[in-house]
Amino acid sequence: MSFTTIFYIGFGGALGAILRSFTNGFVSKIFPNLSFPLGTLSVNIIGGFFIGFLMSLASNINIDINLKSFLVTGFLGGLTTFSTFSYENMLLLQSGNYTNAFLNIASNLLLSLLFCYFGFWIVKVMYA
């Protein structure tokens, strides 16, 4: 892997992490009393959609390796988060909020996968 590719991954990751932080803050301001990690769910659904879209697009057109690395590995890797998802569920379980923990786990898995497929499907329709 070239230094240039590593740079693009790092730069994309930084931007994705910044957007994740802004998204979490924005969602917290809209729903200040919500005891559900909606910000993390939001970024994981958005990331699921865009990785499906971009990977499907990459199978139909030639995307520069640095651009793909920036967008997929860097930006979407920084935007989405499994570690925060895990931590938030641990907190929900420790506080006895089993319903929200279950809903959060199911929502993240099912909706992220559904939106990933939706992004993939959009490109499939575009190139049919």
From Swiss-Prot:
Q: Does the keyword Cell inner membrane apply?
A: yes
Q: Where in the cell is it found?
A: Cell inner membrane
User: What topology in the membrane does the UniProt record assign?
Assistant: Multi-pass membrane protein
Q: Which domain of life is it from?
A: Bacteria
Listed under GO cellular component are:
plasma membrane
Q: Which family does it belong to?
A: Belongs to the fluoride channel Fluc/FEX (TC 1.A.43) family.
Q: What does this protein do?
A: Fluoride-specific ion channel. Important for reducing fluoride concentration in the cell, thus reducing its toxicity.
Protein name, as recorded: Fluoride-specific ion channel FluC
